[in-house]
């Protein structure tokens, strides 16, 4: 098996039993954002400044990244968003932001990222950009691997 061995589909319903192939795993060999470091990082649970995003508003997510290793290091923090229900099939998660942070060994850094309504838009059935009201899941972590992402939910109302 290699990194280019099999296609990965991102636009499907978010079901735990999704498996488009019968003979092999549909999981990627390396998740997007996977990388090696000389140290290790831990993420705290994310906190939102509000849980309802309005049409012209913003939402800020704050979380801590702690360097639990013995060396100083840089981490690329990634933020993903999932639309829980839309009129068209949406990606299970979409990268909506990233930030490089430097953390000294044993220390913790507070990270803030902003969500805007434009980040929730997609091309609807009429092929025009649309932002639908509804529930969304925000995920933060070092890569797109589900098991290490920290999640929190919010709603959008226009």
Region spans (language model):
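Intrinsic-disorder/low-complexity, polar/charged segments enriched in Ser/Thr/Lys/Arg/Asp/Glu/Gln
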Residues: 58-60, 108-112, 149-151
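Glycine/Thr-rich phosphate-binding loops that ligate phosphate moieties of nucleotide
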Residues: 27, 98, 144
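Intrinsically disordered, low-complexity Pro/Gly/Ser/Thr-rich segments with frequent PxxP/GP/PP motifs
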Residues: 87-123, 127
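Short acidic, flexible loop segments centered on an aromatic residue
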Residues: 70-87, 93-95
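Short coil/turn motifs at secondary-structure junctions
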Residues: 68-70, 84-86, 118, 143-145
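Secreted, periplasmic, or luminal enzymes acting at the cell surface/secretory milieu
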Residues: 1-74, 80, 105, 133, ...
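Generic beta-strand hydrophobic packing signal
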Residues: 44-46, 98, 152
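Terminal connector regions
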Residues: 116-158
């Amino acid at each position: 098996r290699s990194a280019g061995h099999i296609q990965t589909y991102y636009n499907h319903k978010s079901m735990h039993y999704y498996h488009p192939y019968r003979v092999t795993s549909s999981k990627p060999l390396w998740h997007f954002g996977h990388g090696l470091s000389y140290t290790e990082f831990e993420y705290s649970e994310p906190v939102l400044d509000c849980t309802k995003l309005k049409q012209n508003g913003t939402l800020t997510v704050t979380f801590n990244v702690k360097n639990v290793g013995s060396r100083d290091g840089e981490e690329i923090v990634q933020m993903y968003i999932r639309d829980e229900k839309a009129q068209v099939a949406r990606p299970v998660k979409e990268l909506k932001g990233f930030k490089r942070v430097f953390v000294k060994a044993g220390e913790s850094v507070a990270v803030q990222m902003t969500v805007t309504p434009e980040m929730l838009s997609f091309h609807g059935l009429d092929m025009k950009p649309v932002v639908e009201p509804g529930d969304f899941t925000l995920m933060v972590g070092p890569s797109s691997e589900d098991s290490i992402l920290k999640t929190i939910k919010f709603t959008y109302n226009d």
